[in-house]
Amino acid sequence: MLEGFKKFSQHNFERDVLNQKGLTVIDFWSESCVPCRQLAKILKQLVQEVPDSVTIGSVKVEDNIELLERFNIRTTPTLLFIKDGELVETRTGVDRRQVIKKLVETYA
């Protein structure tokens, strides 16, 4: 869904998210989720505005059940903010661009 963004899965999550320094924002999305498409548009705008040290990526929930269970994700879209391997914020639903940008600035 998020072309050009890092695609995370249960196979690379540990290496590419939890073992990395800096902030990673992960969008958990589903193909059948209309609000997920709205959030994807917001994230596409934000990727141009955030520092290079921030990684924005996505996880397709249908293919990554283990990650859903690990992070207790019950709805899509869900955004996880992970800083230096630690979960610092979880957001569900579609927030305004300014809200997400402020969270990125807070944790980056």
Language-model segment annotations:
Residues L23-T24, P77:
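Alpha/beta-hydrolase fold active-site loops
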Residues S32-L39:
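Short, thiol/selenol-centered motifs that function as redox-active sites or metal-ligating centers
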Residues F5-F8, F28, A40-V47, P51-E66:
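Thiol-based oxidoreductase modules, predominantly thioredoxin-like and allied folds used
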Residues F5-L23:
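A short beta-strand-turn-helix
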Residues M1-E3:
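N-proximal helix/coil linker or "cap" segments that precede and/or mark the start of modular domains
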Residues W29-S32, T75:
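Short pre-active-site segment immediately N-terminal to redox-active cysteine/selenocysteine motifs
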Residues T75, F81-A108:
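Non-catalytic, surface beta->alpha helical segment in thiol-disulfide oxidoreductase systems
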Residues D27-W29, F81:
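Structural cue for short, hydrophobic secondary-structure segments
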